Amino acid sequence: MAFSLKFDDKKLSTSVWPPLPTLDDKKSEINKKINFITAVNILKGFDYEFKGTTYHFSFDSEDQSNFTQEKIRATKAVEDGKKDEYVAYWRGHVGNKAYTLQFNYDEFIDLLMFSGENKSQQLGTGWVLKDKIAACETKVEVDEMVKTLKIDELERAARDIVDELGLAIKVEDM
């Protein structure tokens, strides 16, 4: 804690204020923002073309779990020699309209791979941003890097997505 003492007309007054954040504190704060941005960009889902139409697929934690469960079912179909009989139904959206789509094994695996690639790309982008922040040696460099990487703009965009989709996620949770 920092403080000051002031004598004025035989009165003693004090002022106390919190310490300035350290370099590590500043980096940690920015990393929380990057984690938030990354998580939102994963959870917002992805667009995927299927049979000539581009659909939006949500990818919240429940959807990710469902993809994993369906992958197990698809793997079992192959193990049982029933790959050609495999069918998966999945919800895709165009605008505000939801469609139930039917995928055969190969089509579903393509969707599954695309979803994984999208998640991996978002994670990779977050790691690159964190590496750039980690390389900063002073608080001034951190501030400059935040501006260069447009972290504040990315965070605002992520907050807008959270509001639009009603996601229950906050920077403070990261």
What does each model-identified segment do?
Residues 2-174:
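A preference for well-ordered globular domain cores
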